[in-house]
Amino acid sequence: MRLTPRALCSAAQAAWRENFPLCGRDVARWFPGHMAKGLKKMQSSLKLVDCIIEVHDARIPLSGRNPLFQETLGLKPHLLVLNKMDLADLTEQQKIMQHLEGEGLKNVIFTNCVKDENVKQIIPMVTELIGRSHRYHRKENLEYCIMVIGVPNVGKSSLINSLRRQHLRKGKATRVGGEPGITRAVMSKIQVSERPLMFLLDTPGVLAPRIESVETGLKLALCGTVLDHLVGEETMADYLLYTLNKHQRFGYVQHYGLGSACDNVERVLKSVAVKLGKTQKVKVLTGTGNVNIIQPNYPAAARDFLQTFRRGLLGSVMLDLDVLRGHPPAETLP
């Protein structure tokens, strides 16, 4: 989403921050290490699996994937599904594909599982991958079993439901949520196709025990892979504002009816709070007694800013643009 020429000219003259303060952020606290159990369950189910579908958010195609997936599940045929393509700026999609191919990922597809975009291509791709593999200990089995993996809240359950709509004309088989942690355990097999006979195993989202950088952690948080309060809604809103301005994505100005683009998160959230009526009464002690004043509810405004971004109402965004252009994520952890 772009500004009018006049507003864009004003925005271009603004002095955007060149970097975001990352020192002292406690990333370990954002990503609690209770997910190892889920990974162990996946490993124990591998002997039943013919292929692995890894689902990830298309807004962060080059960062935030769990490296343990490749290490522990890497012997099986693998398809990377970059979901939520409708929310991602895919202007440089070809470069993204080339970058991933350089990492050894040749089987990649972009999808929008809510609207079933490109989902019909998945089963033929998986069938071809399985056909080229040895299917250790499973040659006598006529049905295909696929494990769906990924970090939390990238659309694994949405993918399963979309495949069922496309190939079985059936409704939901697995619950979908807008926050991480909806799928709690490795579930029983869910049928998604008759010909070929194919079942999927839904799995809980599993984050890496160690995130590569603070900035990668913030990107994952913006995409909803952790509960917002663990990172802090206002911190996330500030990083979102910094990112939108840096990449000249000024849809927030139009959406909230702001006079111009702004790099001060307090001012932006104040305007959002006033526009949406998100204010609160606060008692202030003065020399003449208590006085009630109306203040903006900054946390509520930050939550709205984040949710509006996640619904795509601020325009499509590519959070990995810097990585794509050869700049490593900031504050890489030792």
Swiss-Prot record:
Keyword field: GTP-binding, Membrane, Mitochondrion, Mitochondrion inner membrane, Nucleotide-binding, Transit peptide, Translation regulation
Disulphide linkage map: none
Claim: Nucleotide-binding is one of the keywords in the record: yes
Gene Ontology cellular component annotations, sorted alphabetically: mitochondrial inner membrane; mitochondrial matrix; mitochondrial ribosome; mitochondrion; nucleoplasm
The CP-type G domain, residue ranges: 36-209
Subcellular localization: Mitochondrion inner membrane
A molecular function GO annotation: GTP binding
Membrane topology type: Peripheral membrane protein
Binding-site list for GTP: N83, K84, M85, D86, N153, V154, G155, K156, S157, S158, G205
GO biological process terms on file: mitochondrial large ribosomal subunit assembly; mitochondrial translation; regulation of mitochondrial translation; regulation of respiratory system process
The family this protein is said to belong to: Belongs to the TRAFAC class YlqF/YawG GTPase family. MTG1 subfamily.
Assembly and interaction partners: Associates with the mitochondrial ribosome large subunit; the association occurs in a GTP-dependent manner.
Function: Plays a role in the regulation of the mitochondrial ribosome assembly and of translational activity. Displays mitochondrial GTPase activity.
Name the UniProt record assigns to this protein: Mitochondrial ribosome-associated GTPase 1
Source organism phylogeny: Eukaryota, Metazoa, Chordata, Craniata, Vertebrata
